[in-house]
Amino acid sequence: MNPPINFLPWRQQRRTAFLRFWLLMFVAPLLLAVGITLILRLTGSAEARIDAVLLQAEQQLARSLQITKPRLLEQQQLREQRSQRQRQRQFTRDWQSALEALAALLPEHAWLTTISWQQGTLEIKGLTTSITALNALETSLRQDASFHLNQRGATQQDAQGRWQFEYQLTRKVSDEHVL
């Protein structure tokens, strides 16, 4: 005869394994759902914080741009004014040298009474003491490197015997691009 076998520990072991299996089958999906939900919430809150930080940085950048914009515009305007003054000075220096060259062309007994600049034409009027000085002036004006003799105006002798002359000249170098 065989001794009696106690199946109680085996049954308890099987029952415990059975309960563990079904507990795992019911709890695992629940834990998985809770874990996924938690991860999604953490990811969402992290994205929300990142968006908030980016929005704040963008707003701060916009505020700083609004603050610095007038100063930058003022600096740009000052640079443009400085550049305009520099071009004007260069224009004046160019004219100064051209007018000094024109003055050097005048014979000893000739002087200018009026100089005017209108629409690209320099009009000079003056007096000479003799007709030879007037002819020398016209010859030197024709050979001038700065101006081109356009038109000779009226030439007449006044009551004191001086010769009045009038010439219209144009610059050989264009001034249009300077201003």
Curated annotation (Swiss-Prot):
Top-level taxonomic group: Bacteria
Originating species: Escherichia coli (strain K12)
Main location: membrane
Membrane-crossing residue ranges in chain numbering: 19-39
Classification via PANTHER family: DNA UTILIZATION PROTEIN HOFN
Record-level GO BP terms: carbon utilization; DNA catabolic process
Pfam families per the UniProt record, alphabetical: PilN
Keywords: Cell inner membrane, Cell membrane, Membrane, Transmembrane, Transmembrane helix
Subcellular location: Cell inner membrane
Membrane topology summary: Single-pass membrane protein
The keyword Cell inner membrane appears for this protein: yes
Family annotation (InterPro entries): Extracell_DNA_Util/SecSys_Comp, PilN
GO cellular component: plasma membrane
Function noted in UniProt: Required for the use of extracellular DNA as a nutrient.
Protein name: DNA utilization protein HofN
Gene ablation phenotype (knockout): Mutants are unable to use DNA as a sole carbon and energy source and show decreased competitive fitness when cocultured with wild-type cells.
